[in-house]
Amino acid sequence: LSLPQNFSLDNFAEAMRVTDFWHSLGNSIIITAATIILSLVIHSMAGYAIGRNMSRKKGFKLVYFYIVSGMFVPFAILMMPLVKQTANLGLDNMAGVIILYTVFYMPMNVMLYSGYMKNVPMAMEEAADMDGASAWRTYWTIIFPMMKPMHATVAVLTALGTWNDVMTPLVIMSGSDNITLPLAQLNFQTQFG
């Protein structure tokens, strides 16, 4: 083994050309950013509602366990029915993958948000209620900003899972225009060994 005779970046340029690197990178960024935004909004609202009401109302505990039980279902079991359903609904594109990721990460994120909400005191919400704020305004102006540490945790976990996933875009999206960066790297798995 020795160093190469001539230093060259041609291999990197060829790799970027073969994978359509910039287009794949853009697709990955769009899918990841949209999934994070939808997850933060939808999952935080669900976690807030469940976390605040689980100890007081029996129905919320059942909903919580129903949602969290989704963590025990592996993707391999859901893969073939999802391919058929997304194709029938016309969601075999980036929008379909974003929706699926948002649903896939819901059990974990709702569990995190509801656990966080159990430890947040009710005093701020009660004060907003006394001032005449609606539940919607209380959530967006008081509760949502108070959940910043959990937003950061959910954003990082969702981003890592979305960015590194190969299987979901591979089986859901059709056409080479929609490939993500991890999916584009599959070209090299069989091409060079």
Model-predicted segments: where are they?
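A structural signal for multi-pass alpha-helical bundles of membrane permease subunits
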Residues: 1-193
